[in-house]
């Protein structure tokens, strides 16, 4: 199938992938008097007395704002907010289908950090959570940090944390399959943008042995002048051997390769220099850093990609619906590290020892167990860490 051509045809036919539907009857005068004036004044007064009542008397409790500035849309780059709208609508549709979360797209005409933060903050009282989407690095880090400080609702940049959570789940099971200890594993991550840095942080939080981050300019190491502030910070806490050089150098002897970068930049010869029973997560879309057959030719034992037409698809849809469902169910004020770790462990645990194989390290996107399992784990972690409000 020509997905580009067929998708364009369907988008013209659909005229949008989401819509607003009423949850109340509007058939007669009494219906209107209860849903709108004069009856609606009473819930307004209740909320005026206690803003938290907005979660009980409106749909706020289940509403997620999906925000972009159009600066990093999929692999298309900075195409602008309007051009990002089809992706945001699609994200909202997935929130509803996989987590029963009501999501609303917001495409902001600005690339200014403070302007974006202020815009979102000013309307945050209508929502239970904020999902940041397709915002370029390093601005995305600053936007998330400032919003988290200002807002009393969860803020989650899916390109960072959703990717990190599902990668960590997949690596947990891949290491289990090849009988290697998480704490001894050596990782190379190619792509030191929002996803790569967040993956690195979560793996370190989980106790991975060592991580080397690689950017288009080379290995992140203290003293490299080309690094941005986020990369400089990561250089101080990674790369224990203080390696310098390129990706080829970084891959030698590594147990794991994680790619969130560009197509066709890894060869089977490069994979052959990795440790025995190597694990390769080549997640560039639509064309991975190395095709699975080439990675296996180089000696990779487990291979994962971001694509649905190969085994072991690493897909954020396993994460964000359940994370927000769990956060909303306990009215969490934040999505903290413990909640992210809980989500990752919940996903990994769905693959039993009997089911585990080289081609089955992660649940399928349509596995109906995933959303509820993630939501339950996230809600429990929110309660344990004191960010649950009900």
Describe the function of each predicted region.
Residues 74, 79-99, 157, 161, ...:
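Glycine-rich phosphate/diphosphate-binding loop of Rossmann-like nucleotide-binding domains
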Residues 150-166, 282-285:
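Short, acidic/small-residue loops that bind anionic groups at enzyme active sites
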